[in-house]
Amino acid sequence: MASSVPSARSAYRQLLRATRIAFRDDIRVLIAARQEARRNFDSHRRQGIDTPMQINHAIEVANILRHNIVQGVRESEDEAARWELRIHDEIERGDNDSIKVGGKSVKVDKPCSA
């Protein structure tokens, strides 16, 4: 019978894939994120009571990296240069209904990812 809780190996792979997507062209940050993931997984190598919570935490971090992290890059080295955002296909895009109303409360009847 298969367990509904993903394995630590699966969560680790999801985390590595998410770092690859989020930090695609930023090698320094990509390496640092992967080292941090490895350090956290190595520090919880033995299975304990909180192992399922740790696995779920890793999966949640992977989802945040994959869907909510956008990096910006300057078009040139000039201090006044424009910033370009690296938005990929998996970024969660919301609507701007609350901005259009201007100070009035807005009832949002759908999630941002819908």
Swiss-Prot record:
Which keywords describe this protein according to UniProt? Chaperone, Mitochondrion, Transit peptide
Instruction: Show the coiled coil region(s).
Output: none
An example of a Gene Ontology BP annotation on this entry? mitochondrial respiratory chain complex III assembly
Its taxonomic path starts at: Eukaryota, Fungi, Dikarya, Ascomycota, Pezizomycotina
User: Which residues does the annotated region (Disordered) include?
Assistant: 95-114
The entry's protein name is Mitochondrial zinc maintenance protein 1, mitochondrial
- The annotated transit peptide is positioned at 1-75
Tell me which family the UniProt entry assigns to this protein. Answer: Belongs to the complex I LYR family. MZM1 subfamily.
Q: Where in the cell is it found?
A: Mitochondrion matrix
- What superkingdom does the record give? Eukaryota
Q: State the function annotated in the UniProt record.
A: Assembly factor required for Rieske Fe-S protein RIP1 incorporation into the cytochrome b-c1 (CIII) complex. Functions as a chaperone, binding to this subunit within the mitochondrial matrix and stabilizing it prior to its translocation and insertion into the late CIII dimeric intermediate within the mitochondrial inner membrane. Modulates the mitochondrial matrix zinc pool.
Instruction: Tell me yes or no: is Membrane among this UniProt entry's keywords.
Output: no
Cited InterPro entries: Complex1_LYR_LYRM7, MZM1/LYRM7
Q: List, in alphabetical order, the Gene Ontology terms for molecular function in this entry.
A: protein folding chaperone
Its chief place of residence is mitochondrion
* Cellular component terms per the entry's GO annotation: mitochondrial matrix
- What binding partners and quaternary form does the record give? Interacts with RIP1.
Indicate the transmembrane segments per the record: none
